[in-house]
Every structure is written in structure tokens, then in C-alpha cells.
Amino acid sequence: MADKKAQLIIEGSAPVELPVLSGTMGPDVVDVRGLTATGHFTFDPGFMSTASCESKITYIDGDKGVLLHRGYPIEQLAEKSDYLETCYLLLNGELPTAAQKEQFVGTIKNHTMVHEQLKTFFNGFRRDAHPMAVMCGVIGALSAFYHDSLDINNPKHREVSAHRLIAKMPTIAAMVYKYSKGEPMMYPRNDLNYAENFLHMMFNTPCETKPISPVLAKAMDRIFILHADHEQNASTSTVRLAGSSGANPFACIASGIAALWGPAHGGANEAVLRMLDEIGDVSNIDKFVEKAKDKNDPFKLMGFGHRVYKNFDPRAKVMKQTCDEVLQELGINDPQLELAMKLEEIARHDPYFVERNLYPNVDFYSGIILKAIGIPTSMFTVIFALARTVGWISHWQEMLSGPYKIGRPRQLYTGHTQRDFTALKDRG
């Protein structure tokens, strides 16, 4: 793995030889672990040039628009697989056989119920609390209800916790929504698949149970797949860092939810809807497109381009197809959705956006789909957290399965040098 060497020359010091590591794909990595012995650290705010870990789970090539889960292109998984099969893949490294899939799906279904006492836990939150605030609290509290699987050094405990989290996230997410509306919380149904069950718990009531549209269930399943993992982003890195301290899995996932809540990370599709609100009407599109082109104007078109993908977002094509299917299924006459489709058409053909590869991304289409299905904007990041849980827990599992150290980033200190304490009476 370390076939090459790099040499670091620091003025006044002897050259330092550092191993260069090569992965199966992607850039080579300079191993700086030996640098500490020389009395030097590296400085990389935001870790933009730092590989914090070795991983076999997800690979991204932003320049080529590639996203692979365990080697499989995301487009193929979204088209040919389903969410629980993708979960199995992320957790175990290989696609399941028919028997393995049946057993895994059955295990997840057996864990979808939550402890009845958890319902009373919700009463401690205001009904108008942001759903992500409630999610952070409830998921963190699961360790108080399921403390029979908290030994992180026991592979069986880790597996049970992973299954419980994947199974219970849709139930808890739907409970959060129902609590905010003052409606009765719905129990999961084992005769429904993962996405159908979520929509059932979100939109059905004890007095009226409607069949779930296969088109909407498929759309929801694809949203889950397309958000299942995205390598070492802020929330995944947070989960790994929390996990490195030996924290229990529920606490680690709660930390990931907290990081995802940040608008710079998990709020992108929510920002798309806010932008559409700001534009207001189809007649205003040209004006706002010009504002987006003006470098001196603070207005930005949300849901176009991507920080990682410099060419195109491989998830966006699948999401656009899904968006078209949902809108056709529902036949909604919504001015905001009409505005979104018009904006998409302009951005896909305007030379300014085409030349800069500012195409609609997965957040643009997923926001439209979720709104069309009837999910309120405040729940968008909750859906993201639900889908991303398998990615977080897979990275947590991977870290604990091998040698690891507690995360301890260093700093470039620029504060005061040592000084003596001054008594209060002597301070100017």
C-alpha cells in the first residue's frame, strides 16, 4: 500500500520521509502520522486535504460525477435495488442472497416497534418544537430503553443496535410528525415494505387507513437510497469522532443528527423551498436568474451545482425521473411546483449555468418530491437523517471493527503566551 515516499523539507531541519499510501481508487495519500515525532503538525482547517480514516464503504469522484457504494454505482442501486437491500450492502460489504435478504428484511420488521414508554417521552417537548430538535433528543434517549445492546466491543451487540436504528428511525420520524400535529401515533405494519410503512405511519390515522400509492412508495424508497451514505461528510465524521470515544451507538447517531441539522449540511432541500418562496411567481424567474448571475448580489439559486460534484450529481438524474413520475401520479396543480419546473428548464439551458455545470442536484428534486407527497418543509432534514442512519452506523461499525484511536485533532495556537494572574484590585 505504501510503495512511494514523500519528502518534507522544513528549513533548518533534516528532511522528513513520509510514506505515500495508495487506495484501490482515488488520490494517493501522504501519511503524516510520523510527523508528530518531529515536533510539527499539519494545518488543514475543515479537513479539505486530510483523509481522516481508511474506509471500504463509499467512493466519490466529484470531477467525474461518480458515487459508488461498496463498488456499485448509485444509479444502479436506485434503479435495480431497494433501500433495505442497500442497507445490507453498506453494512456487510456484499449484496445479499435471496435467503440473506429475506432474513435481513424480517429482522428489520421485527424491530420497527418502539418501547411504549417512549411515547410519554415526547410529552416533554413543545408541539411546535423543530422536528430535528425532537429527533436529537429521542434518538439519544434510546440508550435508556435498549441498554441490552450497548457493549460496543461485542459484535453481536453492534449488529443488534444497527438493526434497531434502521428499523426504528421511520417509526420515530413519523411519531415526531404526528406529535407536532397532535394526531395519534400510528403503529408500524409488518405487511408493508420499508417505504410503504413510513408513509402509512406519516399519513394514516386510526379512523382512516388509505392504501399507499406504489409510485409514492417507490419515490420514497429512492430518496432513502440516494441519501444512504456520502463518504466522510460533516455528520459522518461527527459519528466517527463520537464513536472513537467509546460512546454508545444511539448517542453517536444522535450526534450525527445534530451535525446534519446544520443548514450548511442537511438543510439544502429545505433551502430550495425557501428560495421558491422568495421568487414567488413564474413571472419573477428572469429577474432572480439575473440576480443569481450577479456576483455582487447575495441571492443564490439553491439546489444547483454541488460542493463535491464539479461536473454533475449522479443522483440527480434518478431523482429527476422520480420527480416526473410523482408529479404525473399526483396531478398536482401547485404554483410553487410549476415555478420549480420552469426554473429547472431555464437553468438546464441557460449558457451561464451550463458552462459552469450548475445543473439541478439531488436536493432540488428531492425537495419538490417531498413537498408533492405532502411532507412539510420542517420534516425534510428528518427524512435525510432517517435515510443516512445506515451510512452513519456502517461507518461506526467499520471503525470499531478495526484498530482505532480516540479522535484528537490538534491546533495552531495564536492566543496569549504564558502570563501571570493579576489580582482584581490591580486590573485597570
Curated annotation (Swiss-Prot):
Pathway: Carbohydrate metabolism; tricarboxylic acid cycle; isocitrate from oxaloacetate: step 1/2. Its EC number is 2.3.3.16. It catalyses: oxaloacetate + acetyl-CoA + H2O = citrate + CoA + H(+). The keyword Transferase applies. GO terms for molecular function: citrate (Si)-synthase activity; citrate synthase activity. PROSITE patterns: CITRATE_SYNTHASE. Keywords: Allosteric enzyme, Transferase, Tricarboxylic acid cycle. Belongs to the citrate synthase family. Citrate synthase is found in nearly all cells capable of oxidative metabolism. NCBIfam families: cit_synth_I, PRK05614.1. This is Citrate synthase.
